[in-house]
Every structure is written in C-alpha cells, then in structure tokens.
C-alpha cells in the first residue's frame, strides 16, 4: 500500500544559475528561477536539518530558506479541510 511521506521544500539561492544541477543530489528540483537565481528543492522531512547544514557549507549557495507552510494556520473560510465550527447564525 502507498504510504504518504512528510516532505518539505527548501529555497536555495545561488550565486550562479549553472550550479543548479548540483542540487539534484539533495532532493527533487521542482522549480528553477533563472532571473532571481533560486531553486526549489523538495525532500523528506527528516533530512531537512542535515541538508541545510550541508548546503550552507557549499560555496555556490548564497542562502537556504526552509518552507514554513506547515507552521501556518490553514483553518480559514474557503478551506475544504478546515475544522467545522458551529454556526452562530443557524
């Protein structure tokens, strides 16, 4: 049976676009912005902290920013999977 893995995204800012290929060993490259010189890399959640430390040591990397989407409150009006709260009106 298929088991869902927790994955997260890292935004890696580069000095040069030609170094984007080197990031494929760290995870799945989803998007590469050539104008703003960053790459979105998806990887398993348990590998993130070790990978951030490795990437910060690389000379071709300017900055590494993890995704904060899991920490945001996603319980808002219009969300299909939000917790149902009793209505005040009805």
Curated annotation (Swiss-Prot):
InterPro entries: DUF2129
Keyword ATP-binding: no
Domain of life: Bacteria
UniProt KW keywords: Cytoplasm
Subcellular location as annotated: Cytoplasm
Cytoplasm as UniProt keyword: yes
GO cellular component, one term: cytoplasm
HAMAP family to which the protein is assigned, alphabetical: UPF0298
Family named by the database record: Belongs to the UPF0298 family.
Protein name per the record: UPF0298 protein SSU05_1549
